Amino acid sequence: MADPEPEKAQLSSSLNMSAKKELLSTAMKRTSEWIFSQEIPSDVTVHVGEASFSLHKFPLVSKCGHIRKLVSESTDADLATVELPNCPGGAEAFELAAMFCYGINFEIGTENIAMLRCAAEYLEMTEEYAVGNLVGRTEAYINEVALKSLAGAVSVLHMSQSLLPTAEKVKLVSRCIDAIAFVACKDSHFSMLGRASDIGHHNKGLPSKPIVDWWAEDLTVLRIDIFQRVLVAMMSRGYKHYSLGPVLMLYAQKSLRGLQEVFGKGRKKIEPQQEHEKRVVLETIVSLLPREKNAFDLS
């Protein structure tokens, strides 16, 4: 009997490729609409990954320092093609940045702010080139909106994982981690005060039944190395090591599903990369385990 797994993988790959081509086609169609609305023929084609955008040099060079340099330093006086192979966030992020250059309104939110900030950095969209440029706009949203709530900070941090190293360069990762640690420790402090009256027994001064805090679920979407950095930041702010037990348990339950099938008897076949990732998760969690008794008593 034929193994259905390769067929499923091939089908999934085909569907992903089809969806990708459809998204790129939609992006190029939208840019064509921008050109038509300007009633001026495009004079530059910008290639970002597999997507091509037919645009105008003037709105781009007026706000994008990186593109201005490429145009000015080119030996071709009528440079008609610009390559941006390393734009963070790819075609989706560049499309939004281009819309900003054209003065087209779009909504900024926690789901796109990370790639917008990183794309703006890559394109050098600073105040040096235009007042109220994209770097300043995104920074204002990050500081005044995104990092004001734990959900916002976690969402931005989650999106930043695919935008390294630029997200590290603009300190987006470190700022999100600090904001999460601050909120989590603040919440833990007040919740522990509220629980004090319900705790009848202590083991060497420690609560005998740790409770999973409301924010712990949000952290399970983070990559293990980023998750570890969050916990280290929390402990540096005074979060008690023994309180990590329930948080680690929750993360392990989410990220190590099927572990017994992989490493136990009758091992299930798994790709080397996936096996390595699960090993790293397991080893990291073990290294973070609290040493106090009853740290995992969730009953």
Name the predicted role of every residue range:
Residues 123, 138, 145, 157, ...:
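Alpha-helical bundle protein-protein interaction modules that mediate dimerization/oligomerization
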Residues 41-53, 59-128, 143, 206-245, ...:
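Canonical BTB/POZ domain core
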Residues 129-133:
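Classical protein tyrosine phosphatase
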Residues 114-118, 136-139, 155:
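Short, conserved phosphate-binding/catalytic loop or strand-edge motifs used
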Residues 1-55, 92, 99-110, 152-236:
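N-terminal BTB/POZ boundary and linker segment
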